[in-house]
Curated annotation (Swiss-Prot):
One Pfam family hit: UbiA
Family classification: Belongs to the UbiA prenyltransferase family. Protoheme IX farnesyltransferase subfamily.
GO terms for MF: protoheme IX farnesyltransferase activity
Superkingdom as given in the UniProt entry: Bacteria
Keyword annotations: Cell inner membrane, Cell membrane, Heme biosynthesis, Membrane, Transferase, Transmembrane, Transmembrane helix
Pathway this chain belongs to: Porphyrin-containing compound metabolism; heme O biosynthesis; heme O from protoheme: step 1/1
Job description of the protein: Converts heme B (protoheme IX) to heme O by substitution of the vinyl group on carbon 2 of heme B porphyrin ring with a hydroxyethyl farnesyl side group.
Cellular location(s): Cell inner membrane
Gene from which the chain derives: ctaB
Additional remarks: Carbon 2 of the heme B porphyrin ring is defined according to the Fischer nomenclature.
Organism: Rhizobium etli (strain ATCC 51251 / DSM 11541 / JCM 21823 / NBRC 15573 / CFN 42)
Protein name: Protoheme IX farnesyltransferase
Lineage of producing organism: Bacteria, Pseudomonadati, Pseudomonadota, Alphaproteobacteria, Hyphomicrobiales
GO cellular component, one term: plasma membrane
EC number of the protein: 2.5.1.141
Length: 316
């Protein structure tokens, strides 16, 4: 499989049209950043103890900026293949609105800024995890794994799983079994989510030589893997109840959501190979986003309910 690597063919700075603030905001991958902010906030809420609201806001902003910075570095490196893929061709760099060198500088400055401010304002453990997350996504995943192995999403998914752990560390200045479970929920969720996308975007990935699992091992293997990871995610999502940092009620909600997630993955598994419409894969991709938001929302609601009951003198 030939991997596209044509960064030098991109337009030089002088050939760029004038960039707007919106273009730079797009470099931050705002949709991805919103999920990062949400799960990091969940880590803050779920962690035992308290954090000054101002410091909590600074922490969330730093995590958001750090996530956006890694997105900018990803777009800088992937501009050559983004120009070919239909879903990414209109991004600021391949569209000629931002020069690659400007995107690189933007990403590096924001990376340093977010890590240093988080360390100075909150604690250096959370800053170190944020720095490692940026490095992992921009270098380990983007520059190495993405173009070299069909397991790119499995290993690279760790980058997207760190935010709740960072949020937790902002409050406790520690990494615990509870924050590790939050990490694992996202880590195990990522393959089913992205391989569903890879199924109905197979031709795009094939055109640029990115070795996604459907292109390397075929649809059938990918579908088996999607079901396996959906089951593992559903099991992991109920662990907070068994570990004592969420209620039995949360466990029931997580189990119900997990059952739907697995059902959607089985629908993909039953989908005939070569199906051009890929409707079950598209439905799984959409539901997987809702699933993750719903699980972390349920965890936060459960935590807030426990606090309210405790303050009222009851038990939960």
């Amino acid at each position: 499989m030939t991997v596209i690597d044509n960064h030098e063919a991109l337009a030089e700075d002088g050939e760029m049209s004038e960039a707007s603030a919106r273009d730079y905001f797009e470099l931050l991958k705002p949709r991805v950043m919103s999920l990062v902010v949400f799960t990091a906030f969940a880590g803050l809420v779920l962690a035992p103890g308290h954090i000054n609201p101002v410091l909590g806001l600074i922490a969330i902003l730093c995590i958001a900026v750090g996530a956006g910075a890694s997105g900018a570095l990803n777009m800088w490196y992937d501009a050559d293949i983004d120009a070919i893929m239909s879903r990414t061709a209109k991004r600021p760099i391949p569209a000629g609105r931002i020069a690659p060198s400007e995107a690189l500088a933007f990403g590096l400055v924001l990376s340093g800024f977010s890590v240093v401010i988080l360390g100075l304002a909150v604690n250096w453990l959370s800053a170190a995890i944020l720095a490692f997350t940026i490095f992992f996504y921009a270098v380990i995943y983007t520059m190495w794994l993405k173009r070299s192995t069909p397991q790119n999403i499995v290993i690279g998914g760790a980058a997207g799983a760190f935010p709740p752990m960072i949020g937790w560390a902002c409050v406790t200045n520690s990494v615990t079994i509870e924050s590790t479970v939050l990490f694992l929920i996202i880590f195990l969720w990522t393959p089913a989510h992205f391989w569903a996308l890879a199924l109905f975007k197979m031709r795009d990935y094939e055109a640029v030589g990115v070795p996604m699992l459907p292109n390397v091992s075929g649809e059938r293997v990918t579908k088996h893997q999607i079901v396996a990871y959906a089951v593992l995610t559903a099991i992991c999502a109920v662990l907070p109840s068994f570990l004592g940092f969420a209620s039995f009620g949360y466990g029931l909600v997580a189990a119900a959501l997990g059952a739907i997630f697995v059902y959607c993955s089985i629908a993909v598994w039953r989908m005939p190979d070569g199906d051009l419409k890929m409707i079950p894969a598209k439905k799984l991709f959409a539901f997987s986003i809702f699933y993750l938001f719903a699980v972390f929302s349920a965890l936060m609601i459960d935590r807030l309910a426990a606090i309210l009951v405790s303050q009222a003198g009851g038990s939960f």
